[in-house]
A protein has these predicted regions:
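Conserved active-site alpha-helix within GNAT-family acetyltransferase domains
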Residues: 126-152
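Conserved beta-hairpin
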Residues: 65-78
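Conserved acetyl-CoA-binding loop-helix of GNAT-fold acetyltransferases
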Residues: 102-115
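C-terminal "cap" of GNAT-fold acetyltransferases
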Residues: 145-183
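A short, internal acetyl-CoA/4′-phosphopantetheine-binding micro-motif in the GNAT/acyltransferase core
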Residues: 94-101, 127
């Protein structure tokens, strides 16, 4: 991982996470649902936009710092768009194809984002809080989330239904992250 003076990793299109080098114990369960995790390219943008709209994220733009997980048969299985505010990476948003949810794709994508960018901050939709806690994320105060990200919730008509929770995915939870109990 290359880092800049700001402490944020500099991701490059050629830096794909090689899943073939990981043992089954290093990977989340069901990780065979994806071929690689890499930086997005302009060819990926239409699929990212469609997935974002299908996940009720509105129309997204600005994909310079977006990771994608590709499906073995081609196409985008998931994406994680990051925004850097005050030197901190904010996930905004992460979307996994509905048919692949529950197979470790989101966990692998979050781990790859954390490896590239360091600690991650984000706002979790209420129904996803259990997943984020499972991979090692912890709740934080709203003041720890960039106003540019938090305002998405402030202006959302579904806020009461969604029950958003500000969270972070810290570096110090590396041992616990995405490694399910093998008991």
């Amino acid at each position: 991982m290359n880092t800049s003076g700001s402490g944020i990793a500099q991701a490059h299109e050629t830096d794909a996470l090689d899943l073939s080098t990981m043992t089954k114990h290093e990977m989340p369960y069901g990780i065979d649902a994806i071929a690689e995790i890499r930086m997005s390219t302009p060819a990926d943008y239409p699929a990212i936009i469609r997935m974002g709209e299908a996940a009720d994220m509105g129309t997204l733009d600005g994909f310079e710092d977006t990771l994608v997980a590709t499906h073995p048969s081609g196409g985008i299985a998931a994406f994680c768009r990051l925004r850097i505010y005050d030197g901190i990476a904010h996930v905004n948003p992460i979307v996994v194809d509905e048919s692949l949810r529950g197979h470790g794709v989101g966990a692998a994508l979050m781990k790859a984002a954390r490896e590239r960018y360091g600690e991650l901050r984000f706002v979790a939709r209420g129904y996803a809080v259990g997943f984020y806690k499972f991979i090692g994320c912890t709740p934080v105060e709203w003041s720890e989330i960039a106003p540019e990200v938090a305002s998405d919730c402030d202006d959302c008509e579904k806020r009461d239904e969604c029950q958003p929770l500000p969270m972070k995915y810290p570096i110090e939870n590396e041992e616990r992250a995405i490694t399910p109990s093998l008991d």
